[in-house]
Design a protein with these regions (language model features):
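Short, conserved "active-site rim" segments that organize catalytic pockets and cofactor/ligand binding
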Residues: 1-19, 41
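Glycine-rich phosphate- or other oxyanion-binding loops that anchor nucleotides, phosphorylated ligands
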Residues: 2, 26-237
């Protein structure tokens, strides 16, 4: 079983029409869709927006299905000029940018009393996904910063740490929480985002307009990855 997640229904819609032998499972207001895609048994679900919702759903699905891997897709904002709208960003690692424990003398993003700060994607999944050739835009690898904020131009002056301290390449609201849950549970994971905006004054408008294209791009990438995963052993995370 491979878990495929997106924050919102619109980020997973394209997957649902492609599922073979599709079955719906209801859990606490979430509709989860079990079936087969590219010959692999998968479960596609909305995670909900933000760190708490996405962590909750991810932990439930890991407990319920003991998946081989978790793949999270959807949209992100770019933090770098060379990563443009329409490009695809594969997360080499992820960090919670809004986790700050200065009183404990810990660096930003460090989970107190743990080893978790920058959470790396599974190397085999990352290597496989790096072979994907998007129909539009370019493919990048980099660091994704996650927080319970939708970053726009108004916030960027006070969020310079995203690039200066954390050296982030993209920003979104779920990836690092999913990565943390997967890391603790030793489940291989990959976060792949389509760039919808530049975290600027047009971010909200671009985000809404780009959802359909992002969902199609996510489907293409995941279908490619599923085909490649059938040929390898992920081993232990």
């Amino acid at each position: 079983m491979i878990i495929i997640l997106g924050a919102m229904d619109s980020e997973i819609d394209e997957f649902l029409s492609r599922l073979e032998n599709r079955q719906e499972i209801l859990w606490n207001g979430f509709t989860q869709h079990r079936g087969r895609l590219e010959g692999q048994e998968v479960l596609v679900s909305k995670s909900g927006v933000g760190k708490v919702m996405s962590a909750m759903v991810t932990q439930h699905l890991i407990d319920r299905w003991q998946p081989q891997a978790v793949i999270f897709t959807g949209l992100a904002g770019s933090l770098r000029p060379h990563i443009e709208i329409g490009d695809t960003l594969l997360a080499c690692d992820l960090v919670q940018h809004d986790l700050e424990s200065v009183a404990l003398n810990l660096p930003r993003g460090q989970v107190p009393f743990s080893e978790h700060r920058f959470m790396p994607a599974h190397p085999v999944l990352l290597e496989l996904a790096a072979g994907y050739q998007p129909a539009c835009g370019r493919l990048h690898q980099g660091r994704i910063c996650t927080g319970d904020q939708f970053i726009t131009y108004r916030e960027m002056n006070s969020h310079a740490y995203l690039t200066e301290e954390l050296e982030g390449d993209g920003v979104e609201m779920e990836g690092a929480s999913v990565a943390l849950v997967c890391s603790v549970n030793r489940v291989p994971f990959l976060v792949a985002r389509t760039i919808s905006d530049r975290a600027d004054e047009d971010a909200a408008t671009n985000f809404e307009a780009f959802l359909p294209q992002a969902s199609r791009n996510s489907l293409d990438l995941v279908r490619y990855l599923l085909r490649e995963m059938a040929l390898v052993d992920l081993g232990e995370n």
